[in-house]
């Protein structure tokens, strides 16, 4: 697949600290006609999410510092399958702005993409550092397993320090992107326009009739509905449906379905909080933690842990068929 390499073609390195220039380069790369729905935006949001969602508040390990997905132990986690694409998309930006760390670039790309796709402008602070080797990576098993229910969702998100309202707000990221059987075992998109940030995800959760569907290639169960207006099939994951069957989660689903502005405000705050997990700052906002210790809390093993990591030819592909990053990788 050809990658639209616009920032590199524009030639000139920016001044260190010019994050507006970095954002401009990210926006230039969002249009990817040969990739999912013509946009790199959703996978950049997922990269920011997964690079931050390893945090454990008890041990103060994991989080957005380090850019651990450059190494096989984290990048090769089946939960991160397909994110090689996001890293490949951003490599021209890194070459054009070599002064920015990968951990800052990945998180900045997420908030930039959300805003460019019609979402809220999310507060973001720089200063993250990159690991120099793979000795300080968080353990696998900390990211959500979409095949599970409400108990698992709380297990994962409470560990990071989120409450029920924040959990549902962050789930609204499923307004963007789609699932690929080759990556997660699930297939399809949640909403009609997966490159436009909105509250349609919540409205569809409540308005549609969701029926069970098994994906033949993976044997995983998801939920399906055919949109009456467009006649296209949409899907929901077990974790999505759990938001409607749990009484506490459900009240926030109903709130966000009715009021997009409230959802945007709550998502803005929750996503900013997510990107700061594991980051210690002084009164001036400067990052003062030097690393994240390896070890700490492990969540229950996920079903996807038995799935081999995706492999394929170098470069980004529609189905996430890039090789995983090995322990000396620089992407």
From Swiss-Prot:
EC class (word): oxidoreductase
UniProt keywords, alphabetically: Heme, Iron, Metal-binding, Oxidoreductase, Peroxidase
Sites annotated Transition state stabilizer: 46
Annotated GO biological process: cellular response to oxidative stress; hydrogen peroxide catabolic process; response to reactive oxygen species
A Pfam family the protein falls into: peroxidase
Job of this protein: Destroys radicals which are normally produced within the cells and which are toxic to biological systems.
List of catalytic residues: 50, 190
Family: Belongs to the peroxidase family. Cytochrome c peroxidase subfamily.
Protein's name according to its UniProt entry: Putative heme-binding peroxidase
Composition-biased stretches (Polar residues): 306-316
Cofactor: heme b
Upper lineage: Eukaryota, Fungi, Dikarya, Ascomycota, Pezizomycotina
Organism, as annotated: Gibberella zeae (strain ATCC MYA-4620 / CBS 123657 / FGSC 9075 / NRRL 31084 / PH-1)
One of the record's GO molecular function terms: metal ion binding
């Amino acid at each position: 697949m050809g990658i639209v390499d616009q920032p590199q073609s524009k030639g000139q390195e920016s001044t260190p600290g010019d994050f507006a220039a970095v954002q401009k380069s990210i926006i230039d790369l969002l249009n990817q006609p040969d990739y999912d729905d013509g946009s790199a935006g959703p996978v950049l949001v997922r990269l920011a999410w997964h690079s931050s969602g390893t945090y454990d508040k008890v041990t103060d390990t994991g989080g957005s510092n380090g850019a651990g997905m450059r190494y096989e132990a984290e990048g090769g986690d089946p939960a991160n399958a397909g994110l090689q694409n996001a890293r490949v998309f951003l490599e021209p930006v890194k070459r054009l702005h070599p002064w920015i760390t990968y951990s800052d670039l990945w998180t900045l790309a997420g908030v930039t993409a959300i805003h460019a796709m019609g979402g809220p402008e999310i507060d973001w602070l720089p200063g993250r550092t990159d690991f120099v080797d793979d000795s300080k990576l968080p353990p696998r098993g900390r990211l959500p397993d979409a095949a599970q229910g409400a108990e698992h969702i709380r297990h994962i998100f409470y560990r990071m320090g989120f409450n029920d309202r924040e959990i549902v707000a962050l789930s609204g990221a499923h307004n963007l992107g789609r699932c690929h059987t080759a990556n997660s075992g699930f297939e399809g998109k949640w909403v009609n326009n997966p490159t436009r940030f909105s509250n349609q995800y919540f409205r569809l959760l409540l308005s549609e009739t969701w029926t069970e569907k098994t994906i033949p290639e993976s044997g995983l169960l998801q939920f399906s509905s055919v949109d009456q207006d467009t006649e296209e099939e949409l899907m929901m994951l077990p974790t999505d449906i759990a938001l409607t069957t749990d009484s506490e989660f459900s009240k926030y689903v109903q709130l966000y379905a009715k009021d997009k502005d409230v959802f945007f405000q709550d998502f803005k705050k929750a996503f900013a909080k997510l990107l700061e997990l594991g980051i210690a700052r002084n009164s001036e906002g400067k990052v003062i933690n030097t690393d994240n210790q390896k070890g700490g809390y492990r969540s229950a093993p996920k079903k996807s842990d038995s799935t081999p990591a995706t492999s394929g030819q170098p470069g980004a592909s529609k189905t996430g068929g890039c090789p995983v990053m090995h322990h000396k990788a620089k992407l």
